């Protein structure tokens, strides 16, 4: 059997953008740091990493679409944090953000990763942003690196 998989290394010219939803910035700043750490650990150069800031998770799909259309990046890592409150707002924002990122990703020929936390509590978000459950920003960047390299093999 022939196994095809993406490697976890970057060449020195690879350009990746992190799109960060600033809302819940105490969490999302940690996700960005995790994503940056993964980029550098896997061989990326800091000057080839861009950070695009948007107000909240709902704005991620639009910024993703514009970033892809700019043709400046080889891959894009989206991060954010949507934390459940006492209204249905969480359900709408998390669902539409997920659908929007998926739709943009599938309609363009560029790897995109989804590092948007959707948690019931702030404690769960903190756990996923660098404490007990690792850093999902780091994982999202690792995923997009692997998918970028896989796309070169397919």
UniProtKB/Swiss-Prot annotation:
It comes from the Bacteria. It catalyses: (2S)-2-hydroxy-3-oxobutyl phosphate + 5-amino-6-(D-ribitylamino)uracil = 6,7-dimethyl-8-(1-D-ribityl)lumazine + phosphate + 2 H2O + H(+). CDD domains: Lumazine_synthase-I (cd09209). InterPro entries: LS, LS/RS, LS/RS_sf. Pfam families: DMRL_synthase. GO terms for molecular function: 6,7-dimethyl-8-ribityllumazine synthase activity. (2S)-2-hydroxy-3-oxobutyl phosphate binds at residues 86-87, 128. Its EC number is 2.5.1.78. GO terms for cellular component: cytosol; riboflavin synthase complex. Pathway: Cofactor biosynthesis; riboflavin biosynthesis; riboflavin from 2-hydroxy-3-oxobutyl phosphate and 5-amino-6-(D-ribitylamino)uracil: step 1/2. It is an enzyme of class 2 (transferase). Belongs to the DMRL synthase family. PANTHER family: 6,7-DIMETHYL-8-RIBITYLLUMAZINE SYNTHASE, 6,7-DIMETHYL-8-RIBITYLLUMAZINE SYNTHASE DMRL SYNTHASE LUMAZINE SYNTHASE. Catalyzes the formation of 6,7-dimethyl-8-ribityllumazine by condensation of 5-amino-6-(D-ribitylamino)uracil with 3,4-dihydroxy-2-butanone 4-phosphate. This is the penultimate step in the biosynthesis of riboflavin. This is 6,7-dimethyl-8-ribityllumazine synthase.
């Amino acid at each position: 059997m022939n196994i095809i998989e993406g490697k976890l290394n970057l060449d020195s010219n690879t350009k990746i953008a992190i799109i960060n939803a600033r809302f819940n910035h105490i969490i999302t700043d940690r996700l960005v740091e995790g994503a940056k750490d993964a980029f550098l650990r896997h061989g990326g150069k800091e000057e080839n990493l861009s950070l695009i800031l948007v107000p909240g998770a709902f704005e991620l799909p639009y910024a993703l679409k514009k970033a892809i259309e700019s043709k400046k990046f080889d891959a894009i890592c989206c991060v954010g944090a949507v934390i459940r409150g006492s209204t249905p707002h969480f359900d709408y924002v998390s669902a539409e953000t997920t659908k929007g990122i998926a739709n943009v990703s599938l309609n363009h020929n560029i790897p995109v990763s989804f590092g948007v936390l959707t948690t019931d509590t702030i404690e769960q978000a903190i756990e996923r942003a660098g404490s007990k459950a690792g850093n999902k920003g780091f994982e999202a960047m690792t995923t997009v690196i692997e998918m970028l390299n896989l796309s070169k093999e397919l």
